[in-house]
């Protein structure tokens, strides 16, 4: 039998694409704007995956509603925006520490799959999501946070560079993607749209490797 040579991939693996970081889209819905005082109410995350050609695509979404942590506040106006009904019988909210474990478990599994060292949060106004995530980690004394504590990929910046748009709805549409305003302000929907936006931009502008 003739030996058949295997052509190596021409793209870097995920473990090298972002310096060992796995991009993970996170979107949170909250009881206000102050992460030190307002409650985390809903969180969704989507690890970014890579196909055999090096193109990025959104992985599976994981989400949960969150029981407001003791001592945190909720601005009623925030509930008007998100449409969250705290006592809805089908909300099935988890306590904050269990919610974090629920979200972080698939992140760690995807990191292992791609041999990445840490996760890096991708978000639209990403530091808002990261600050609420870090506040929850601190409140619960969670010890296995896979995310970098301060570095992010912000799709506001990326979309501004790529399309001249910074509002999520407008950026998504400028990228040629669908947007339904009625579904916005759900952590799952916003995370899905942010993930597709990030992948569209990243796949459109190929990696330039310094020679």
Curated annotation (Swiss-Prot):
Gene3D superfamilies linked: Ribonuclease H-like superfamily/Ribonuclease H
InterPro entries: Exonuclease_RNaseT/DNA_pol3, RNase_T, RNaseH-like_sf, RNaseH_sf
Organism of origin: Xylella fastidiosa (strain 9a5c)
Main EC class the enzyme belongs to: hydrolase
Family statement drawn from the similarity comment of this UniProt entry: Belongs to the RNase T family.
Catalytic residues identified in the record: 185 (proton donor/acceptor)
PANTHER family per the UniProt record, alphabetical: DNA POLYMERASE III SUBUNIT EPSILON, RIBONUCLEASE T
Free-text comment on the cofactor: Binds two Mg(2+) per subunit. The active form of the enzyme binds two Mg(2+) ions in its active site. The first Mg(2+) forms only one salt bridge with the protein.
Residues the record lists as binding Mg(2+) 2: 27, 29, 185, 190
Names of the cofactor(s): Mg(2+)
Function according to Swiss-Prot or TrEMBL: Trims short 3' overhangs of a variety of RNA species, leaving a one or two nucleotide 3' overhang. Responsible for the end-turnover of tRNA: specifically removes the terminal AMP residue from uncharged tRNA (tRNA-C-C-A). Also appears to be involved in tRNA biosynthesis.
Stated name of the protein: Ribonuclease T
Positions annotated to bind Mg(2+) 1: 27
């Amino acid at each position: 039998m003739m030996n058949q040579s295997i052509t190596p991939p021409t793209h870097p693996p995920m473990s090298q694409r972002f310096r060992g970081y796995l991009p993970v889209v996170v979107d949170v819905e909250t009881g206000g704007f102050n992460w030190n005082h307002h409650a985390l109410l809903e969180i969704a995350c989507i690890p970014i995956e890579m196909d055999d050609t090096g193109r990025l695509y959104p992985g599976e979404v994981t989400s949960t509603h969150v029981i407001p942590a003791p001592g945190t506040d909720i601005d009623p106006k925030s509930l008007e925006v998100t449409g969250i009904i705290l006592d809805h019988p089908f909300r099935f909210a988890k306590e904050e520490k269990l919610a974090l474990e629920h979200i972080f478990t698939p992140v760690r599994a995807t990191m292992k799959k791609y041999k990445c060292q840490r996760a890096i949060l991708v978000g639209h106004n990403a530091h808002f999501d990261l600050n609420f995530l870090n506040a929850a980690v601190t409140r619960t004394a969670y010890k296995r946070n896979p995310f970098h504590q301060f570095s992010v990929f912000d799709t506001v910046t990326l979309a501004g560079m790529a399309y001249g748009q910074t509002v999520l709805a407008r950026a998504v549409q400028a990228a040629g993607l669908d947007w339904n305003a009625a579904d916005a302000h759900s952590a799952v929907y916003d995370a899905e749209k942010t993930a597709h936006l990030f992948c569209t931009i990243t796949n459109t502008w190929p990696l330039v490797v310094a020679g």
